[in-house]
Design a protein with these regions (language model features):
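Sec-dependent signal peptide recognition
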Residues: 10-18
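N-terminal, Lys/Arg-enriched amphipathic/low-complexity engagement segments
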Residues: 38-44, 169, 183, 188-194, ...
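Short secondary-structure "cap/edge" segments that initiate or terminate local elements
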Residues: 31-180, 508-515, 523, 528-565, ...
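Non-catalytic interaction/targeting regions
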Residues: 68-70, 88, 98, 177, ...
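Cleavable N-terminal signal peptides
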Residues: 18, 28-29
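N-terminal secretory signal peptides that target proteins for export/translocation
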Residues: 1-11
Length: 710
């Protein structure tokens, strides 16, 4: 039986293609790779679920445990605990429910900042963000050679990307060249921001020494769904997260204190009814550190850097990072349903950075003399409840990560309906890890249901141990800086055994049944070319994990096994190990590059660079997907199987190159127009008997909603 299903792509408009092509010089030359926008661990884990689909396309399994659901005739609001099976990156800090886990309670909008924040309006750069400057590129000659030669403006010419994930809806939105908010999502959604509705960061109210340099941020965004329900993000002071440079340069303190995430605060049902209200508490600061090394060399005359006939050679080894001001969900309430869900949390004792890591930053940035900026941020106890209660903590101990201890469901008279408690491995020598989840009945002292979890026994190293592969997963191999010419890329190769470190391997359910998970590294049969125009035939392994087998056993001992093969042209008689991988690697790791060109003054130059971080982001998309699979086989215990086929680079969904650039020579920083949003969609799902006879097929077709950029 064949079923044809038609679906629609919602898409970005021409602005994405426009901005991708505005290259006025060779961007980023002479700089270390820029640290991306760093949200809190909770916002990052929430965003991971919205951006990296749990699907065969990415090799990830759906692992979800229901906690509670608020239901009425207008809205269904589930609270669930979910796990992401893609692997544990070494420098990604666990969220408040432990490594790999995420508490799906409401949702958030998280910003991917492109160059400058859209709302930038600071004394040194007044009204310079894209919110104010979008009209600069609303012109017909934006891609002319003359404009390509203009020096980089101090005004922003590229919008930030805002990703969202809430209650089963996910996508992105951004501001276009006419000042309209454009949405990219599989659901028909509308984004509203009220002009002029800005909020000065919270620290300005409490004696912050650099308040004059703060830029007001977007106060709130409203997303409206097809039914007319309104979802409000931000709006209140304690529902917006911020980050700042942990060690700003002299004279720039406070200038980079920007909003990174806006959390869901209210749901207003269409047609009336009481809103669902989310309340938050601002937690103590947390940090995210990184180490980068680079070598750069310039020869010839480059007007903006060198005098005629000069050359430059620079080596840089740097430790830096971000200080983040997170918020934590306190409660969800809905008067119409007489329900309130309370979230109780406390400081964890988990592994974090060493004092020596922070001292190294202080030594490099301040000469080891002062750490005044951190003191200013952290010695404002009126701002953060935890600091009011623990005001005498040592400076670096004031970076504190919370863990969720308990979820209690009560009625509006505080009578308990359900309680869920979380049990962790919580020690200073390991990352926070969820051991068990227990449900209690009202007034009960013993759990009525318990889920327990077991993980791969390989240990993860300390933070900043520099034992990661190309993609940031564990490979237990140091890559010393002096090896950069000979074998740096080989030293960064993935290791399947170490990539599996502390990955979830077993769930035991309250019924006594179990699920066991097996994994292997990603594989690929082709690579997207650096200019994004074509595919290059090349095989290999990429890091991160894909599920290879799931074995589920019930309390009676009955077992169901599912195996997954990420290959092309599978048949029952074929050995999957001999078949070609259907995986496409988004970006090949690259640590060196050289380029020759003409500067804006007409003089020639040669430029080369080595970086300990890849000079091209891995991957070249906002979701972080390194490999996507065009075809995946799911084989069951009885030999029957299903083949899933997906949209990908190789079947009509390539990215497109820039319209124009100055110096038409490839450099890693050249942007492109992304069709990432259109990849990973089902094309065909076909079920077969164990002998290979088809029994059912579903075929999907898609159409763009609006006008795709062309």
């Amino acid at each position: 039986m064949a079923i044809s299903i038609k679906k629609r792509f919602s898409c970005l408009l021409k602005i994405s293609g426009t901005l991708a092509a505005i290259l006025v010089t060779l961007p980023g030359l002479g700089q270390l790779p820029v640290l991306p926008t760093v949200p809190s661990p909770n916002a990052a884990s929430l965003g991971q679920y919205g951006q990296i689909p749990v699907s065969n396309y990415t090799g990830t399994a759906s692992v979800e445990i229901p906690i509670y659901t608020i239901e009425d005739t207008k809205l269904t609001i589930p609270v669930t605990l979910s796990y992401h099976t893609g692997g544990n990156r070494l420098e990604s800090h666990p969220g408040w429910v432990g490594l790999g886990w995420n508490m799906n309670t409401g949702g958030a909008i998280t910003r991917i900042m492109n160059r400058l924040p859209d709302e930038l309006d600071a004394p040194t750069l007044p009204k310079s963000g894209f919110y104010y400057t979008h009209g600069d590129i609303d012109q017909t000659d934006w891609s002319s050679d003359a404009n390509m030669k203009l020096p980089p403006p101090l005004r922003d010419i590229e919008p930030d990307i805002f990703t969202f994930n809430f209650l089963g809806m996910s996508g992105k939105f951004f501001l276009d060249e006419k000042g309209n908010w454009q949405v990219q999502s599989d659901q028909p959604l509308k984004v509203i921001f009220s002009p002029g509705d800005f909020l000065t960061p919270f620290i300005s109210k409490y004696g912050y020494a650099f308040s004059a340099y703060l830029t007001p941020t977007f106060r709130k965004f409203t997303i409206i769904d097809q039914q007319g329900n309104q979802y409000i993000f931000g709006d209140t002071e304690n529902a917006i997260e911020y980050s700042d440079d942990i060690a700003p340069k002299t004279g720039t303190a406070g200038a980079a204190f920007f909003a990174t995430s806006w959390f869901l605060t209210k749901i207003i049902p269409a047609g009336g009814g009481s809103p669902v209200v989310y309340t938050y508490e601002r937690g103590p600061y947390v940090s995210s550190l990184y180490v980068s090394t680079s070598l750069t060399s310039i020869n010839g005359y480059w007007k903006e850097v060198l005098a005629p006939g000069c050359s430059s050679w620079t080596q840089s080894i740097s430790t830096s990072g971000k200080v983040i001001s997170p918020v934590y969900l306190k409660s969800i309430s809905n008067p119409d349903r007489n329900i309130k869900i309370n979230f109780s949390f406390s400081a964890s004792h988990e592994l974090t950075y060493k004092d020596a890591d922070y001292n190294k930053i202080a030594l490099e940035r301040y000469g080891g003399v002062t750490r005044d900026y951190l003191k200013i941020l952290q010695r404002l106890p009126a701002i953060i409840p935890y600091y009011r209660q623990n005001d005498e903590m040592a400076l670096y101990r004031r970076f504190v990560w919370f863990k969720l201890d308990k979820v209690s469901v009560t009625d509006t008279l505080s009578r308990q309906i359900r309680e869920v408690r979380f049990n962790y491995t919580d020690t200073s020598i390991s990352r926070l890890e969820l051991k068990a989840l227990s449900f209690f009945s009202p007034g009960g002292s013993q759990p009525v249901q318990t889920y327990s979890f077991e993980y791969n026994t390989t240990k993860l190293p300390d933070y900043l141990a520099s034992l990661g592969d190309h993609w940031g997963y564990h490979n237990n191999t140091a890559a010393p800086f002096n090896n950069q010419i000979l074998n740096y890329e080989q030293l960064k190769a993935p290791s399947e055994g170490y990539t599996k470190a502390r990955i979830l391997e077993k769930i035991t359910y309250p019924t006594g049944g179990t699920s066991n998970f097996e994994y292997n590294l990603h594989s690929y049969g082709s690579i997207v070319s650096n200019d994004r125009r074509s595919l290059v035939a090349q095989t290999g392994n990429a890091s991160g994990l894909r599920v290879s087998k799931i074995r589920s056993t019930d309390a009676a001992g009955q077992t169901l096994t599912k195996e997954y093969f990420y290959v092309k042209n599978y048949t029952p008689s074929a050995n999957p190990a001999t078949l070609a991988s259907s995986g496409i690697l988004d970006t090949k790791p690259q640590y060196n590059f050289s380029v020759s060109g003409i500067d804006v003054g007409g003089a020639g130059f040669n430029y080369s660079m080595f970086s300990s971080s890849t000079v091209i982001p891995l991957a070249q998309n906002t979701s972080g997907i390194s490999v996507g699979y065009s075809e995946v086989v799911e084989r069951r215990s009885d030999g029957s199987y299903t083949i899933y086929q997906f949209t990908n680079h190789d079947n009509g969904y390539k990215d497109t190159a820039v319209v124009n650039s100055y110096n038409n020579t490839y450099t890693p920083a050249i942007p492109f127009t992304s069709y990432e949003f259109a990849r990973g969609k089902p094309l065909r799902t076909t079920s077969y008997t164990a002998t290979g006879s088809p029994v059912q097929m579903q075929q999907y077709s898609y159409a763009f909603v609006g006008s795709p950029w062309q």
